[in-house]
Amino acid sequence: AACEDGSVHVWTPAGRRLVNALILDAQPVIMDCRGWCLLCVNAVGMCYVWNIKTLSSPHPPVSLAPVLDIAATAQQGHTTNGPAVMFARLNSQGRIVVGLSNGDGYSYSQAMYIWQRLSEPWWAVGSQYWNTADTSISTVQPTSKGTNGTSTADDDLKPENLSAGIIPLLERNTTTQSLLRGRAYFLQRLVKTLLVAEGYEGFESAVSVAHLENRVAAAMTLGAREEFHLYLLMYAKRIGAEGSKAKVEELLRSLMGSVFEDEDEKPDEEKGQGWMAEEGDLVGWPREELLKEVVLILGKLLSHFLVQINCD
């Protein structure tokens, strides 16, 4: 329970007090819980996250000032309307997810102590993949089993998969806020004008590839297992169709665990995370399985390309 005096009280389901009152520097305005994690956002934009089970916090209190464009607004000589917080949520790992009225969506990194932007209106008007999912990928994937061979029905109950749906939620908020503010029509006209201009022939393609890369990175950041798998295959299909040899080679090397490894480089004792990790699974998926599916997609694109050449 949150009170006007800036205190937060926690009780058990039976009504017993679990901990002493938690005193904040301002009145709580947004609260959310996910599992044992409790999120509290107060009136001055400070975000607190507590683990009620371990009576600890994954990171110090963090301010919403960076995502509210405080730095940009302070440099202007006149008063401007700043974005408002539409919702604040927690994922299964206790990570803060925030959606704003300007269409931006952010997540706070507990490891790097920084806000990361996961969604923005720019992708909505320039990407061919906005509000879409490649059904040809999702329907032909050979398996949806994880490392332990269980079905997706069982995976939905596991904590690592509770982040599923966060990226579509943020993108839907981006679409809604862009339409409400009337920006979508103006930006779409601007992009259409650029597409027919000389020198911008590959503009839409570049934005679409960048949007898929943003989706893959966001899914990895949030630990969204099923979405990472889908977006990765969509990305592999797109860069294969674009003929981006350097990106294809780097993607294959990263799936094998040696994306930035040089022949003359000495072994580093410090272990990397994400794409920098040399071994282990990627967001709950075995690297060998992901590599096999990516190679299968690239092989189909290559065979289709060779058939077209023979027909010509």
What are these regions (language model features)?
Residues 92-95, 100-142, 146, 154-165:
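Acidic, small-residue rich beta-repeat scaffolds with periodic aromatic anchors
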Residues 1, 8-11, 40, 50, ...:
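Long, contiguous hydrophobic alpha-helical segments, chiefly transmembrane helices and signal peptides
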Residues 48, 106-108, 113, 129, ...:
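Sequence-level detector for tyrosine residue identity
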